[in-house]
Curated annotation (Swiss-Prot):
It is found in: Cytoplasm, Myofibril. This is Paramyosin. GO terms for cellular component: myofibril; myosin complex; myosin filament. Residues 1-9, 834-848 are annotated as: Nonhelical region. Its main location: cytoplasm. Belongs to the paramyosin family. Homodimer. InterPro entries: Myosin_tail, XRCC4-like_C. Keywords: Coiled coil, Cytoplasm, Disulfide bond, Motor protein, Muscle protein, Myosin, Thick filament. It holds the Pfam family Myosin_tail_1. Paramyosin is a major structural component of many thick filaments isolated from invertebrate muscles. Residues 10-833 form a coiled coil. It comes from Dirofilaria immitis (Canine heartworm). It comes from the Eukaryota.
Amino acid sequence: AFGSMSVADLGSLTRLEDKIRLLQEDLESERELRNRIERERADLSVQLIALTDRLEDAEGTTDSQIESNRKREAELQKLRKLLEESQLENEDAMNVLRKKHQDACLDYAEQIEQLQKKNSKIDRERQRLQHEVIELTATIDQLQKDKHLAEKAAERFEAQTIELSNKVEDLNRHVNDLAQQRQRLQAENNDLLKEIHDQKVQLDNLQHVKYQLAQQLEEARRRLEDAERERSQLQAQLHQVQLELDSVRTALDEESAARAEAEHKLALANTEITQWKSKFDAEVALHHEEVEDLRKKMLQKQAEYEEQIEIMLQKISQLEKAKSRLQSEVEVLIVDLEKAQNTIAILERAKEQLEKTVNELKVRIDELTVELEAAQREARAALAELQKMKNLYEKAIEQKEALARENKKLQDDLHEAKEALADANRKLHELDLENARLAGEIRELQTALKESEAARRDAENRAQRALAELQQLRIEMERRLQEKEEEMEALRKNMQFEIDRLTAALADAEARMKAEISRLKKKYQAEIAELEMTVDNLNRANIEAQKTIKKQSEQLKILQASLEDTQRQLQQTLDQYALAQRKVSALSAELEECKVALDNAIRARKQAEIDLEEANARITDLVSINNNLTAIKNKLETELSTAQADLDEATKELHAADERANRALADAARAVEQLHEEQEHSMKIDALRKSLEEQVKQLQVQIQEAEAAALLGGKRVIAKLETRIRDLETALDEETRRHKETQGALRKKDRRIKEVQMQVDEEHKMFVMAQDTADRLLEKLNIQKWQLGEAESLTMANLQRVRRYQRELEDAEGRADQAESSLHLIRAKHRSSVVTGKNASASKIYVL
């Protein structure tokens, strides 16, 4: 457009320069014509002076010559008058020409001013149009860039949509796989929850068992300490018993030696008695029965003492057996205690591992709840974003309908503009034909004028030759001049008539052309204004479409961002799913470990129960032993009381025997020594009795201590068992309460899982709907891109048509200006031809 306007301005300037140059040429031609007329006038004056001289020279001729001279003078007077008239006419014509020239100059000056104004206006219009053209070119370049960018973006978006559709298909398949895996994981999760619940129950049981085992361990430790103390006491007692046993054995050895000695002495005494029997039969006869009684009693007492010694030896062997059995039991208890300590350490480690697993499971449950809440929030945000996208989609549909209406309106306007352009083209074609016809007529007139000028020149040449041959060919010249005058008059009249007709036709054509040009100019200006309005509307529509495209691109970016967010969320969910799988595998491994630990704990519990049963059996054995010991104690007490009674009786009898012995010693001197020996033997027996009494007392003390220890151990065991029973009852109540709470929590978790499953299904449906809406939006975006491309092509076509109309209008204006300039040239030439014709006629008249 800028190039076309600059070319139009240059064309108008060149046309103005051509007009000025033509006016200067016309002025120069008129000056030359005036100089030529003055020269011809000077030549005619010289010829007139020469003719007057010749007439003066010929005055002396004949009268005919005088008359001819008179006639010639009269003719000369006429010629002078004609010359003066022609001069006056020439002066009038010159004045008229000057006036016309001045008027023409003024007209040309006015036209130049108008043209300058038009030029300045055209310059301003040109500058404005240049600015508009620059802006339009910038906008067109921007539109082309935007179009190129939009095409690239559209291609990129198409590629992205294809990729996204592929990704969405993959995601759908993956979502289906995830749904299946989720269902499978849900079932596994339910199983794991059940197993976790069972593990929790077992863990609580194990904790309770651990607590009980800890209590049992404490009790076992206390019992072990008590057993160790008892063991140390028993060892001390055993050492004392061994010492006593050694002393008793030494005493028994001494007693056996004494018995052997006593038997030997008894044998000696028997021999002595048999020896002295004969001597003292009379003396002993009195005391024989008493001695027999005493011997029998002594034998009985000896037998009883031997029986008591055997009983004590049996008791000592039983005590040794009990000691060995207690030692073996203590060793077994130590081994069991070590086993219990090992099992307790294992159970403590298992408890710590289970506590760690429970804490990890709690942390994982908290993480899963947090992730579930985050997923719910993201789902709610996705629903809100989907609602926004629905609203934007509805707005885009409304904008699409508005654009469709505007496109339809623009298509109607373009159709009308096309029809108007077709009419304008048809009229321009007609004007071109009319201009061509007028140009042909102008060329014909120019040829006719050239022919007339050539004829005028020929006439002037002939007139000059006639003036040269005036004297010889006067009559012929008069006749020819008359003919020429008639021909010139007829030609002048014809030319004047033709010129008037042509000027009228030219004026009519000029008026029609100006009216048509003004009408076409107005029409074209109106059409250009309408087209500019349509272009502005199209630009606005294009800008709005660009805005809508930008909005839709932003929406697509938002959708792409949301899709990327959903992809990231899906990737996060996949990562979380993989983490959950790993966690599930770890939990399954930990569950297996927990199962193994639980089996170990169950086995340890069974072993502890077996140990408890064994401990109970041992307690019952100890109780039975205690009962046996109490029975033995009672029996020993009765035996001790009987032995004490026997000892009292023996002491009484011994006193009686002493008395009797004293009496017998008093009666028999030989019996004194025997009695003295018997007395010593009785003293030894008393010492043995005292030692046995001390041993019995020590055994009673030991039995009482053992009984007290057994009673204390039994009471402690019973108290511990009662506390354990109470603890087991409280633990059972707590476990039942926890079981109920865990069942309620499991029911809540099941409901929550069902709700989450429903939410996931709804989110999947919403995702499918969002994908469908995204596909529809992409299709609509492609349609709008195609419509935008068509609108841009239509705008480019309209701009090209407007530029073509502007060029055609400028060409029409140029042709109109050329026609005006050619018309002015024809008028100027017509004026110059008229003036030259008048001058030629005047010169011819002067020659005649």
